[in-house]
Amino acid sequence: MEIKCHRVSGGCAEGPALVTRERISFLGNVDPETGVVVDPAHELYGRSIAGVVLIFPGGKGSTVGSYVIYQLRKRGMAPAAMINLKSEPIVAVGAIISDIPLVDRVPEWILDVKDGTRVVVDARREVVVLPDGSVKV
């Protein structure tokens, strides 16, 4: 199934989905050395964001979060791609300077995709590709 989206940062990537309904502050929620979510109050606590298609409503917090995303990329610990309901400047800048595909303006039911589902983010074509039957719409 192809879902139309809006390109924030170009490129194409695929990987297993990692989904949260909570916003992410890259400064404080994520260890920039390992890519592991270190905030015990976050639902992704203890999970790695490295190599996944990270699906979350959007970012929050300090502008330093953009640089944390860049650090993650330099260390090979960044998400393969990111999908937001609505991107904000911190995540957008982080994705752009790190060359990570980022799209937004997707249906809210994208947050119902199961972790591990293979997702393709083709920001060039402004589509997200999900396997048929991966989510009930």
UniProtKB/Swiss-Prot annotation:
Lineage: Archaea, Methanobacteriati, Methanobacteriota, Stenosarchaea group, Methanomicrobia
Keywords associated with the record: Isoprene biosynthesis, Lyase
Entry's family note: Belongs to the AcnX type II small subunit family.
Protein name listed in UniProt: Phosphomevalonate dehydratase small subunit
Disulfide pairings: none
GO biological process, one term: isopentenyl diphosphate biosynthetic process, mevalonate pathway
Source organism per UniProt: Methanothrix thermoacetophila (strain DSM 6194 / JCM 14653 / NBRC 101360 / PT)
Subunit description: Heterodimer composed of a large subunit (PMDh-L) and a small subunit (PMDh-S).
CDD domains per UniProt: AcnX_swivel
Enzyme nomenclature, EC number: 4.2.1.182
Listed GO MF terms: hydro-lyase activity
Biological pathway: Isoprenoid biosynthesis; isopentenyl diphosphate biosynthesis via mevalonate pathway
InterPro entries named in the record: PMDh-S-like, PMDh-S-like_dom, PMDh_S
Active-site residue list: S62
Role noted for this protein: Component of a hydro-lyase that catalyzes the dehydration of mevalonate 5-phosphate (MVA5P) to form trans-anhydromevalonate 5-phosphate (tAHMP). Involved in the archaeal mevalonate (MVA) pathway, which provides fundamental precursors for isoprenoid biosynthesis, such as isopentenyl diphosphate (IPP) and dimethylallyl diphosphate (DMAPP).
Leader sequence residues: none
Catalytic activity reported: (R)-5-phosphomevalonate = (2E)-3-methyl-5-phosphooxypent-2-enoate + H2O
Domain of life: Archaea
